[in-house]
């Protein structure tokens, strides 16, 4: 067999080439080094994969709580607003950081070592409304739709139906900030705005 190597008599720790196959031995060594290097590189997508999962979960959670009673188009619109915020340098640069951006209660941190958002001081109202953020088991189907939409938004499968909106509110409220923003569209119960 041409891969047969023999221990050198002079140097027991080295090998000598019997059939002129040193090039193949080098190739195998380089392949093994490359395989090791690739294994090290491939280890980093594990963190990417967990980040991907976390980001999808954060985005889906926001879509669920903000738009679970809207059409699919309305759910996509809420997800797009979240994405548009991630893309702007005036907001955090991850979905989880955008969704959970809030002023935290110092008292809770000092007395209970917990981060609890201050009511009405969050980017998205569901996060600081004082209610549980656990997805109810009876609403698993809507949660699955939210996850599907979140994956599509994260992987750029949808066109931005909000035309770059970074803010929105329900039609039945009139926040002061809305006067400073440009109206882009209305989808279902939400009115969308962009800060130009």
Label for each model-derived stretch:
Residues 1-21:
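N-terminal Lys/Arg-rich, disordered targeting/topogenic segments
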């Amino acid at each position: 067999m041409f891969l047969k190597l023999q221990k050198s008599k002079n140097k027991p720790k080295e090998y000598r080439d019997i059939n002129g196959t040193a090039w193949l031995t080098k190739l195998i060594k380089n392949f093994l080094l490359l395989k090791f290097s690739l294994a090290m590189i491939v280890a980093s997508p594990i963190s990417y994969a967990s980040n991907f999962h976390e980001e999808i979960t954060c985005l889906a959670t926001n879509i669920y709580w903000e738009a679970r009673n809207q059409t699919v188009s309305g759910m996509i619109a809420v997800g797009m607003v979240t994405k548009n915020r991630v893309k702007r340098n005036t907001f955090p640069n991850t979905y989880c950081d955008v969704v959970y951006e809030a002023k935290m209660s110092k008292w809770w941190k000092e007395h209970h070592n917990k981060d609890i958002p201050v009511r009405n001081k969050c980017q998205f109202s569901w996060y600081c409304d004082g209610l549980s953020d656990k997805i109810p088991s009876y609403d698993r189907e809507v949660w699955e739709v939210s996850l599907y939409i979140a994956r599509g938004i994260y992987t750029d499968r949808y066109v931005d139906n909000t035309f770059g909106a970074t803010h929105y509110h329900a039609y039945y409220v009139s926040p002061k900030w809305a006067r400073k923003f440009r109206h882009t569209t209305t989808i279902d119960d939400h009115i969308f705005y962009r800060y130009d």
